[in-house]
Amino acid sequence: MTPETVQIASILGAAFAVGIGSLGPALGEGRAVAAAMEAIARQPEAAGTLSRTLFVGLAMIETMAIYCLVIALLLLFANPFTG
């Protein structure tokens, strides 16, 4: 493979990693926030507990997007095949 081909493949791989890798967390976070808002609307006195649990869950969901970003950065800037 030529260096140009490897560079193009790295750019496309990074774009797919960030593009597709952010869809899951975005949908998951949207559903989690919607469910938390619905639960708080039903039981306002439990808002503190629900908010705390929501933030922990959102942090766990967001790790997938962060991992995809790290993979994309590795493909772009630390790719061992680019020479």
Swiss-Prot record:
It is a multi-pass membrane protein. One of its GO terms (cellular component) is plasma membrane. SUPFAM superfamilies: F1F0 ATP synthase subunit C. Disulfide bonds: none annotated. One of its GO terms (molecular function) is proton-transporting ATP synthase activity, rotational mechanism. The chain crosses the membrane at residues 8-28, 58-78. Keywords: ATP synthesis, Cell inner membrane, Cell membrane, CF(0), Hydrogen ion transport, Ion transport, Lipid-binding, Membrane, Plasmid, Transmembrane, Transmembrane helix, Transport. Gene3D superfamilies: F1F0 ATP synthase subunit C. It comes from the Bacteria. The keyword Transport applies. The keyword Translocase does not apply. The record marks E62 as: Reversibly protonated during proton transport. Belongs to the ATPase C chain family. F-type ATPases have 2 components, F(1) - the catalytic core - and F(0) - the membrane proton channel. F(1) has five subunits: alpha(3), beta(3), gamma(1), delta(1), epsilon(1). F(0) has four main subunits: a(1), b(1), b'(1) and c(10-14). The alpha and beta chains form an alternating ring which encloses part of the gamma chain. F(1) is attached to F(0) by a central stalk formed by the gamma and epsilon chains, while a peripheral stalk is formed by the delta, b and b' chains. HAMAP family: ATP_synth_c_bact (MF_01396). F(1)F(0) ATP synthase produces ATP from ADP in the presence of a proton or sodium gradient. F-type ATPases consist of two structural domains, F(1) containing the extramembraneous catalytic core and F(0) containing the membrane proton channel, linked together by a central stalk and a peripheral stalk. During catalysis, ATP synthesis in the catalytic domain of F(1) is coupled via a rotary mechanism of the central stalk subunits to proton translocation. Key component of the F(0) channel; it plays a direct role in translocation across the membrane. A homomeric c-ring of between 10-14 subunits forms the central stalk rotor element with the F(1) delta and epsilon subunits. This is ATP synthase subunit c 2. It comes from Cereibacter sphaeroides (strain ATCC 17029 / ATH 2.4.9) (Rhodobacter sphaeroides).
